[in-house]
Amino acid sequence: MSIWDTLFGRTPRYTPGTEPDHSFGRYTDAYKSRENYAAWDRAVDAFEEDRFLDSCAAFLEYLRDEREDNVKWQREENRLYFEFYQGSKRVTGFADREQLRATARIARLERPDTDPLRRLTAMNYELKYSRFALDADDCLTIIFDTPVIDASPHKLYHALKEMALRADKQDDLLLEEFGGTLSPVEVTHLAPLSAEEKRLKLQFLRESIQSVIDYLGGGAINPEEHPGAVAYLLLELVYRLDYLLIPEGHTMEALERMHRMYFAREAEQPVTFKNVRLLGELQSLLRRAPEAFAEELYGGKSTFGITLPASHDRLSGLIRNELPNMDWYQDNGFPEVARAIPGYIAGYALFNYAVPPPDRDLLQLYYRVSENVYFQGLGYRQEFLGRDGRPARRPLKAAIGEIVERHRREYPRMRPVTSHLSFDNFADFGRSYLEMVGELDLSRP
């Protein structure tokens, strides 16, 4: 920052490329490179020509994400060995002229206990391609195998995705529930977070939940008269915690359960009842031991995403449907609820959809502004709020321009109208920002 910026209270210029490289949100494999898609075509062609090992090798090349360094393979004569990562789990396997087999160890059974075995046996009925088993080393394992003649790229994708996602989800849940019986296995690939980052994330979790609880308990809004407002506040919080903290295990399952519960088609449950359940779940997270939450925070690589790809039109429709609901709350003295609605839209989209990369980057930039203090704590130096607490015009427009340049090759028609952005207050900024995002042209020539 120059002396003139300091004297006049200006926000420093946007300086891309100098920020830390933290990951946020759920991994998606929905948008691959041209090289990945070319590898898929080779895999299909090789399978149709009965060149099964060539097909498997090309399929693994399709799965590989260079940024994640998530898939490795090696061919030795008539065998192909491979491994890939999904969060906390490593999947290993091989293919030869007869079969393809993949396994992932979930946890080690330290002493006989039928409860976790019964749990996984019951889950086998939910699986289409894979199965849980106990291996020779007393490790709870998930297995997929198939004759190579039946190992088409389409089948391999769905089967390996099923086993990888199940393994990644179940290890933390089983270890928490059966900690006296099970122990972690094959977790050396995980990148531990620093104690300071864990402390910061725990603080963010607790302060965010407590802030909403305090607002609802302060009498500013009647939850019986305005259940929709309460729902916006609670769901915005759920999606924000999921995207910014990326928790695993119990916390991730709790956040997903809250989403499922609220949107379950249960005609007899009024919104007020669902809000009470949401609030109870959030209070339970608040009461958890810090060390339990800390164990759910780690860095890992992923290969498969759990969100389905969605077009820009889907996001635009969500914005058009939800954004007008801000009007009543702004006009009737509920600024906190009005501010929560753009956050709800951004969070809902990132939680449920694999939106196009420009949309994802722009929605994350929204979080950079709304949670400026949190990002500063993570080491991001760029300020997106001025000293008066309002969104900062210059760095925001520069950051939007940098996102446009990053995606210009794939989306040459993307031209955000930044002149319509409002910087008067955060609610107006959120409205104008999402309107700008919704009006983008992400069609390709």
Residue ranges: model-predicted function:
Residues I3-R105, L109:
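N-terminal catalytic cores of peptidoglycan-degrading enzymes
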Residues T103-D137:
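Short, internal acidic amphipathic alpha-helical interface segments
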Residues L134-H158:
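Well-ordered alpha/beta subsegment
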Residues L156-Q170:
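Short amphipathic C-terminal alpha-helix that caps PH/PH-like domains
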Residues G217-H226, D242-H250, W328-D331, R415-S419:
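Charged, low-complexity interaction regions
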Residues N325-P445:
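Charge-dense, extended regions
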